[in-house]
Structures are given as C-alpha cells and as structure tokens.
Curated annotation (Swiss-Prot):
GO terms for biological process: autophagosome assembly; autophagosome maturation; cellular response to nitrogen starvation; mitophagy; protein transport. InterPro entries: Atg8-like (IPR004241), Ubiquitin-like_domsf (IPR029071). Its main location: membrane. It is found in: Cytoplasmic vesicle, Autophagosome membrane; Vacuole membrane. This is Autophagy-related protein 8. The C-terminal 3 residues are removed by ATG4 to expose Gly-116 at the C-terminus. The c-terminal Gly is then amidated with phosphatidylethanolamine by an activating system similar to that for ubiquitin. It comes from Phaeosphaeria nodorum (strain SN15 / ATCC MYA-4574 / FGSC 10173). The record marks G116, E117 as: Cleavage. GO terms for molecular function: phosphatidylethanolamine binding. SUPFAM superfamilies: Ubiquitin-like (SSF54236). The gene is ATG8.
C-alpha cells in the first residue's frame, strides 16, 4: 500500500527527520499511522506519532481508537507491512523488524481485516 506521507515528503527529508527524532528521543519510536484507503473507518487527525518503545501493539491500538473516537463495539485492525502484528508485541520489536529505510515505522489501520494474515 502506498503511503501518502511518503508521497508528500521526499526520502531525504523523512530520513533526516527520523534520525533527528531517534537522537533526541532514543526511547521513542517514530510512527506514521494512516488509514487503509478503501476502509470506511474514520480518518485519523494526525499521522505522526512518537511512541514509547515499551508500549505494546495493543496499547497503541487503544491510542488510535481514542484519536478516531471509535465506539467500543466497532473493530479496528492495524497492519505493519500488510500483516497483523501480535497485540502483546512491543512497539520496539515491531520497529526493529519492520522499520522503513527512512527510519519510520509505517502502520495502517482499517475497520475490517483487509489483508487477513497474522505475523
């Protein structure tokens, strides 16, 4: 899936920003979170997040749910490289395994399990 953030910002600028963030906040993970294009779920108000390294994927999902004001009965799925990461996994381990060459971790979310595969 194409990232709008990548389309809007040149690689060198993204890489420099991620490096600056990691140097200044070495206990944080730079994350870009975008909605899957064809999903009917609400669009998030901001794409860039600075996530504590010890946050779990489940806790990050909770943050996203709050930001898009998703009611408890509605489902949300997040994807890293088009697969569902384990809920108990630490964001730091997901970052180490899946960070982009620009230094950001790209996460997409959807109201439906669009890709259907777990890591």
């Amino acid at each position: 899936m194409r990232s709008k953030f990548k389309d809007e910002h040149p690689f060198e600028k993204r890489k420099a920003e991620a490096e600056r963030i990691r140097q200044k906040y070495n206990d944080r993970i730079p994350v870009i979170c975008e909605k899957v294009e064809k999903s009917d779920i609400a669009t998030i108000d901001k794409k860039k997040y600075l996530v504590p390294a010890d946050l779990t994927v489940g806790q990050f999902v909770y943050v996203i749910r709050k930001r898009i004001k998703l009611s408890p009965e509605k489902a949300i799925f997040i994807f890293v490289d088009e697969v569902l990461p384990p809920t108990a996994a630490l964001m730091s381990s997901i970052y180490e395994e899946h960070k982009d060459e620009d230094g950001f971790l790209y996460i997409t979310y959807s109201g439906e399990n669009t890709f259907g595969e777990a890591i």
